[in-house]
């Protein structure tokens, strides 16, 4: 008798995705981050659901409702900090996942890659709206500054911003709609994840060598299930340590001050995972130019498959490209640092140099280096 997991219409889909899925035997731990992202999404949806039961999306009570969750709700404090720091873990895994895709040429699977870019935008939008909900000073002013960027769009900018605000400033209507979208988007993300996996399983995973691995496959279970469980346990350990020992390490102290439209904080800045994009935005003196650079800093991922000039898929055997990749990683860390600094000398010029370098590496240096490596291989 055939196993039910191979014949049942529903179980068959799960079986083909998580049990009998052929995986290249050479995939390393860099391939773990997909499952870690799924775990992060599950943690965020669960903690978010319970937080939503106690949160009120009204300007008069939002800040107090978060305080109430932390003080009066059973284990409310741990839910709140798991959710806040879970977002940080989410972005750490997300950036490593994208970095692995760049390093090992996973962008050659264009459908999977493009859905991934869409997912990145959706997660960033969700995180931004979530940051507004506690209605502290940084929530209010962050929402004001970032939504105001849309006013740089010619002709329709001002009307568009007021339409998003639901009034003439960030107020009750804005908070209510941000809560509605923040609740809805993770479920849309979950649906997109299924589509992401659907396209991935059409082609199968890539591997560190970049050569076809059809003759050398292993089943997903038990090899990669055990490997993924280990990764998830390690991530949950890190998250638990962050939540239990220093829950406010990655947050902004200004967000413990209730939102006040009459008092601007000295340094308005987003959460750490947006600082690199914020630094690129600030490095351009022109408003529209800054907004375009901000969007392009993420959207540039979409043109990377077109810029692939190497005869090899991955960077595993391309030392010059590896140097550029790690230079790009260092540049992003520099931008993250600059984004958290005040707008003054020498931070301005460092930010501008790092922003120019970011686009130069991706658009110019990487394709040219790949061409050079192709010629070196002829020797």
Curated annotation (Swiss-Prot):
KW Transport (keyword) present: yes
Entry's localization field: Mitochondrion inner membrane
InterPro entries: Cyt_b/b6_C (IPR005798), Cyt_b/b6_C_sf (IPR036150), Cyt_b/b6_N (IPR005797), Cytb/b6-like_sf (IPR027387), Cytochrome_b (IPR030689), Cytochrome_b_C_euk/bac (IPR048260), Cytochrome_b_N_euk/bac (IPR048259), Di-haem_cyt_TM (IPR016174)
Keywords for the protein's UniProt record, in alphabetical order: Electron transport, Heme, Iron, Membrane, Metal-binding, Mitochondrion, Mitochondrion inner membrane, Respiratory chain, Transmembrane, Transmembrane helix, Transport, Ubiquinone
GO terms under biological process: mitochondrial electron transport, ubiquinol to cytochrome c
Residues annotated to bind a ubiquinone: 201
Essential cofactor(s): heme b
Cofactor-binding details, from the entry: Binds 2 heme b groups non-covalently.
Spans through the membrane: 33-53, 77-98, 113-133, 178-198, 226-246, 288-308, 320-340, 347-367
Membrane topology: Multi-pass membrane protein
GO molecular function: metal ion binding; ubiquinol-cytochrome-c reductase activity
Residues involved in heme b b562 binding: 83, 182
Keyword S-adenosyl-L-methionine set for record: no
One Pfam family here: Cytochrome_B
GO cellular component: mitochondrial inner membrane; respiratory chain complex III
Other noteworthy facts: Heme 1 (or BL or b562) is low-potential and absorbs at about 562 nm, and heme 2 (or BH or b566) is high-potential and absorbs at about 566 nm.
Biological role: Component of the ubiquinol-cytochrome c reductase complex (complex III or cytochrome b-c1 complex) that is part of the mitochondrial respiratory chain. The b-c1 complex mediates electron transfer from ubiquinol to cytochrome c. Contributes to the generation of a proton gradient across the mitochondrial membrane that is then used for ATP synthesis.
Record note on quaternary structure: The cytochrome bc1 complex contains 11 subunits: 3 respiratory subunits (MT-CYB, CYC1 and UQCRFS1), 2 core proteins (UQCRC1 and UQCRC2) and 6 low-molecular weight proteins (UQCRH/QCR6, UQCRB/QCR7, UQCRQ/QCR8, UQCR10/QCR9, UQCR11/QCR10 and a cleavage product of UQCRFS1). This cytochrome bc1 complex then forms a dimer.
Record family assignment: Belongs to the cytochrome b family.
Protein name as catalogued: Cytochrome b
Organism: Pteronotus macleayii
Lineage: Eukaryota, Metazoa, Chordata, Craniata, Vertebrata
């Amino acid at each position: 008798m055939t196993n039910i997991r191979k014949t049942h219409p529903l179980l068959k889909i799960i079986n083909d995705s998580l049990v009998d899925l052929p995986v290249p035997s050479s995939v390393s731990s860099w391939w773990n981050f997909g499952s870690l992202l799924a775990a992060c999404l599950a943690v965020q949806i669960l903690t978010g659901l319970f937080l939503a039961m106690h949160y009120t999306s009204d300007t008069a009570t939002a800040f107090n409702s978060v305080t109430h969750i932390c003080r009066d709700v059973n284990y409310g404090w741990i839910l709140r900090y798991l959710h806040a720091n879970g977002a940080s873990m989410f972005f750490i895994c997300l950036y490593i996942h994208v970095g692995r895709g760049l390093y090992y040429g996973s962008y050659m699977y264009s459908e999977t890659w493009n859905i991934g870019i869409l997912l990145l935008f959706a997660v960033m939008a969700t995180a931004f709206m979530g940051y507004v909900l506690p209605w502290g000073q940084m929530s209010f002013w962050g929402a004001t500054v970032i939504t105001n960027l849309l006013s740089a769009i010619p002709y329709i900018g001002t009307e568009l911003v007021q339409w998003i605000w639901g009034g003439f400033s960030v107020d009750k209507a804005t908070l209510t709609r941000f809560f509605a979208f923040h609740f809805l988007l993770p479920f849309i993300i979950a649906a997109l994840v299924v589509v992401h996996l659907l396209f991935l399983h059409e082609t199968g995973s890539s591997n560190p060598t970049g050569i076809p691995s059809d003759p050398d496959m292993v089943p997903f279970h038990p090899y990669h299930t055990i490997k993924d469980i280990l990764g998830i346990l390690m991530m949950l350990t890190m998250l638990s340590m962050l939540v239990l020992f220093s829950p406010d390490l990655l947050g902004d102290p200004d967000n413990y001050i209730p939102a006040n439209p009459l008092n601007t904080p000295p340094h308005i800045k987003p959460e750490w995972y947006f600082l690199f994009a914020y630094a690129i935005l600030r490095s351009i003196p022109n408003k529209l130019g800054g907004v375009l650079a901000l969007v392009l800093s993420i959207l540039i991922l979409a043109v990377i498959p077109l810029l692939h000039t190497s005869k090899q898929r991955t960077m595993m055997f391309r030392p010059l490209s590896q140097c550029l990749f790690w230079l790009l990683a260092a540049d992003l860390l520099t931008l993250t640092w600059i984004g958290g600094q005040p707008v003054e000398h020498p931070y301005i010029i460092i930010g501008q140099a790092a922003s120019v370098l970011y686009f130069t590496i991706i658009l110019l240096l990487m394709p040219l280096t790949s061409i050079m490596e192709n010629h070196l291989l002829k020797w």
